[in-house]
């Protein structure tokens, strides 16, 4: 089974990966795709900022942050067993997560229930949208979920 773990770089996303690792049997998971999605609107300055002339640098920094977020999750899962890949997409987070799951024929999507970021207020609940549109099971990990000792191989 392929598993998609969505991350926005938050502590909650990292906790969601640790939670999966704490109870899932790594022998039933063939691969894990760690996915971060950058919003195309994230590179657009606020109206009060005007044109900074640094759009290319801003886009690179958003992508670098997304790559760092996927690398952090991949590091947590590195010694666990299943093959881990990392991907950064651009678009609506919920849409891109669902698309990635369909493309990989994922058996499970893991997502944190909230990131605590201001962008979550503007975009609504990514976890809720994924839950309503995914064609596979979705594990929504709430803040404070207790992580037990990881399942052994």
Question: Each predicted region: which residue ranges?
Answer:
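Small/aliphatic-rich secondary-structure junction motif
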Residues: 1-53
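Intrinsically disordered or low-complexity boundary/linker segments at protein termini
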Residues: 1-19, 133-153
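Short, well-ordered secondary-structure micro-motifs
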Residues: 16-17, 43-47, 98-99, 121-122, ...
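General small-molecule cofactor/ligand-binding pocket signal
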Residues: 33-35, 85-89, 139
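Short secondary-structure boundary segments
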Residues: 36, 112-114, 142-143
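A short acidic, glycine-rich active-site loop
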Residues: 53-68
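Structural beta-alpha unit
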Residues: 75-109, 146-153
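Glycine-rich, Arg-bearing micro-motifs that act as flexible, cationic patches
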Residues: 108-129, 147
């Amino acid at each position: 089974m392929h598993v998609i773990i969505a991350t926005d770089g938050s502590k909650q996303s990292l906790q969601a990966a640790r939670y999966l690792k704490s109870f899932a049997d790594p022998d039933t998971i063939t691969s894990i795709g760690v996915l971060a999605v950058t919003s195309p609107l994230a590179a657009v300055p606020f109206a009060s900022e005007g044109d900074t002339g640094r759009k290319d640098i801003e886009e690179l920094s958003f992508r670098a942050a997304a790559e760092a977020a996927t690398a952090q999750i991949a590091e947590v899962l590195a010694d666990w067993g299943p093959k881990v890949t990392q991907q950064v997409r651009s678009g609506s987070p919920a849409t891109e997560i669902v698309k990635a799951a369909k493309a990989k024929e994922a058996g499970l999507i893991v997502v944190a229930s909230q990131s605590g970021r201001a962008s979550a207020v503007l975009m609504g609940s990514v976890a809720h949208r994924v839950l309503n549109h995914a064609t596979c099971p979705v594990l929504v990990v709430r803040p404070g979920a207790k992580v037990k000792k990881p399942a052994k191989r």
